[in-house]
Amino acid sequence: MASVRNNRLIKFIPGIFFLLFGCAPVATSLPKGTEYDLSARDTLEKFIKAHHIKDTFKAVARIEINADGKKYPIKVAMMLKRPSFMRIESIPVIGLPDLFLSANNDTLKIFLPKENEFYLGRPSRENFSLFFPVNLSPADVLSIMMGIPPLPDVKLRWKESVEGEKLRADFFSDDKKILTLLMDGNNGRLKEIVILASDGEILHTVNYDDYCQVENIDLPQKITILSKGKNSTIVVRYSDMEFSKEENEALFDLPIPVGVRPIIMDRGSSPHRQGS
């Protein structure tokens, strides 16, 4: 069932990704070649101004998914709010949206109107990867799209170095490198995120390009995500970017349509309709 759904839904895959970088001058504040013990929170605060983290990011994204030797273009509207609130819907050329998605700390919901299918489950990477060609949780996806490294909330060791004209920061957990950041040495803009497995294998590479300013914040208008495990490439191009102060978290919760029985994604190896 999952393989059929992957083929059917891949054209609906929402772009995974927003950005809040202009604040990445973390690299310039550390002596080259030194090491520091710091928490994930400390690290993220080096990259983002605290008052912007609280705002909701809104944008239109044109996304091209390359997977299984095919290309799937899609246009979506999105709202993203840290730490884990996500709301996305497709923008069709004509007719009604093909995809609605919401995620928060507890729940992932996906509604496909054409199939009249509503999926409900935990916001886990296993559930998310049933539909989208990335082995990432919704929270990790949100961080990547906000230009924030998806670090675990544990003690990390950070080692910084210089790589050509770029500043490099490697993050270690239990002496194993889990993530590498590359930043422009001239302006501190985040250029690349490399996510690694515990054995050192590269799982995902994220590249950021075409920066512009939104409310005096440098934001990349283009994000490219390479997922080795899924053998996929996703290119996201943003427009109409803005920040707003959305206090109503209910806006990020997708209601179950009347008459539609939810398909629960956490029961066994494949989703089951509620009550079956």
Please identify what each model-predicted range represents:
Residues 1-23:
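Sec-dependent bacterial lipoprotein signal peptides
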Residues 23-73, 256, 266-276:
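N-terminal leader/targeting segments and the immediate start of mature chains
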Residues 49-57, 69-72, 79-84, 186, ...:
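Edge/loop elements at the starts and ends of beta-strands within beta-rich repeat scaffolds
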Residues 55-63, 74-80, 84-90, 99-101, ...:
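One face of beta-strands
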Residues 59, 88-89, 108, 141, ...:
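Buried hydrophobic packing residues in well-ordered domains
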Residues 62-66, 93-95, 110, 213, ...:
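Hydrophobic lipid-interacting interfaces of membrane-associated proteins
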Residues 85-139:
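An acidic-aromatic
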Residues 157-259, 263-264:
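Gly/Pro-enriched, hydrophobic low-complexity segments
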